[in-house]
Amino acid sequence: VGIGYWCSFVVGVAMIRCSKLWRILREINNIEISDRVSYKTEIFPYQWKIALSWASGYFVFQLFNPVLFATSGAVVAGQMGMTLAAVNGIASFSSSWISTKVPTFSGLIALRDYVKLDRLFNITMKQLGVICSIMLLFFWIVIATLRYWDVPLAFRFLDLLSIAFLEIAILANQYGNGWATYLRCHKQEPLLVNSIVGAVTCGLSTLFLGKYFGALGMTCGYAILRVVLTCWNYQVYKQKKSKWHTLNN
């Protein structure tokens, strides 16, 4: 078996060596590079902040299920997992409205065409909000209808009030992510502190409320904190946008 693996490797290398790909790679290697990008000075100072911001959000979502599993049992933890999968899928779909515009936003910022930038961004944010709201409402209505008819599948999700709280948090988070994307297109990350504070407060809220009030308390606390943090993100967005655009005009 070991010889067979080595033979497939040698054959693959030989095929590359004899193909046009090898000549293309050799020509690319011979191209002289005049402009170099310093990862240490141009990329890393921005990327480590982005990494911390994303890790903070990831940390919050990964706490829900373990806490509920330990305090409320496997059934409730499974319901939370199913509900999170559904609403996160909706969030991922609706966020494509903003994520696909990142190259356009960045290009307009480079051209300093802030009027066109803001017009496009505002339209995109409205589309994102409407799409996300409609899909979240539709999901809630479907679960409510299935529960009314006692369809077993509906009881694999959280209760309707917990779902509503979670959907409020998801919708608020979508707006916060949209403003964060706008700011990051300027090659800056001013929301690092917001993200860390959000991770700590939401984490503590999850641990405390999940232990004493179950899924309903956990989702309610998360919704309240997410709305407050989104308002904070909006203030940073307004301040930084005004400051950066004034300096660059």
Task: Describe each region flagged by the PLM.
Residues 71-74, 185-186, 212:
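Helix-loop interface residues and adjacent transmembrane-helix termini in multi-pass membrane transporters
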